[in-house]
């Protein structure tokens, strides 16, 4: 089990949203300083370009580049990666994993990326059992398990994001394992060490934690200790 602290970016600032709603934004400050704090405890973080997700193209890659240069952290980033050029630019600035959302359902595009780049990850952004699209603004028609059965032919690394839980601090979804040996990372509502234990029991290999850290609901050190114990078995 791995723990990935999250930084969501909007207009160059670190923010959090409630259930992905733009009007619910809460600002937490300088993302580079926040990343520097995380770098004392972890070597990899999760970054979301919210402007990119809403607008359809990355808008905060310069901030991501600064985070990498000034902290040495490994970074996985999502938000608006819908062209080959945008994905390529992210890898140029030093990103380790580019996370695709909506565009991953274009399997010709996905295949081209996986042929060219390593570390491509797909985010299954779920609401009511279906994949949400266009920055979570629209609910899609495809069921999450149907999407997974298609996408698993191209990638083996996924993020499962519960939109209804995101930013709520209400705990994690009750999800029955529907994947095999693919790497699955959970995001949405994580607010305690017990959540991490439950997710590990369901087969998740990683967890993304955001608002619970920013609001002081849980300490990153405590989550990392639990994750270490889980890895030991």
Curated annotation (Swiss-Prot):
NCBIfam families: PRK04128.1
Catalytic activity: 1-(5-phospho-beta-D-ribosyl)-5-[(5-phospho-beta-D-ribosylamino)methylideneamino]imidazole-4-carboxamide = 5-[(5-phospho-1-deoxy-D-ribulos-1-ylimino)methylamino]-1-(5-phospho-beta-D-ribosyl)imidazole-4-carboxamide
Main subcellular localisation: cytoplasm
Molecular function terms from GO: 1-(5-phosphoribosyl)-5-[(5-phosphoribosylamino)methylideneamino]imidazole-4-carboxamide isomerase activity
GO (cellular component) term, any one: cytoplasm
Pathway as given in its UniProt record: Amino-acid biosynthesis; L-histidine biosynthesis; L-histidine from 5-phospho-alpha-D-ribose 1-diphosphate: step 4/9
Protein known as: 1-(5-phosphoribosyl)-5-[(5-phosphoribosylamino)methylideneamino] imidazole-4-carboxamide isomerase
Keyword check for Glycoprotein: no
EC number(s) reported in the record: 5.3.1.16
Family to which the UniProt record says this protein belongs: Belongs to the HisA/HisF family.
A GO BP annotation: L-histidine biosynthetic process
Keywords linked to the UniProt accession: Amino-acid biosynthesis, Cytoplasm, Histidine biosynthesis, Isomerase
Primary gene name: hisA
Subcellular location: Cytoplasm
One Pfam assignment: His_biosynth
């Amino acid at each position: 089990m791995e723990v990935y602290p999250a930084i969501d970016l909007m207009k160059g600032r670190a923010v959090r949203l409630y259930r992905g709603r733009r009007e619910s934004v809460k600002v937490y400050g300088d993302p580079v300083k926040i990343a520097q704090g995380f770098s004392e405890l972890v070597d990899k973080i999760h970054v979301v370009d919210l402007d990119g997700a809403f607008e359809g193209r990355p808008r905060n890659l310069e901030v991501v580049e600064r985070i990498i240069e000034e902290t040495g952290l490994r970074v996985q980033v999502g938000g608006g990666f819908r062209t080959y050029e945008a994905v390529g630019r992210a890898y140029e600035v030093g990103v380790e994993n580019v996370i695709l959302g909506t565009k991953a359902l274009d399997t010709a595009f996905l295949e081209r990326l996986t042929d060219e780049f390593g570390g491509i990850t797909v985010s299954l952004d779920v609401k009511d059992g279906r994949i949400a699209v266009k920055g979570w603004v629209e609910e899609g028609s495809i069921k999450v398990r149907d999407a997974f059965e298609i996408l698993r032919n191209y990638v083996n690394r996924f993020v499962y994001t519960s939109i209804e839980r995101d930013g709520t601090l209400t705990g994690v979804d009750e999800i029955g394992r529907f994947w095999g040996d693919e790497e699955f990372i959970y995001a949405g509502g994580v607010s305690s060490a017990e959540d991490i234990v439950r997710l590990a029991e369901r087969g998740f290999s990683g967890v993304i934690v955001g608002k619970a850290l920013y609001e002081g609901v849980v300490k990153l050190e405590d989550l990392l200790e639990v994750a270490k114990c889980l890895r030991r078995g």
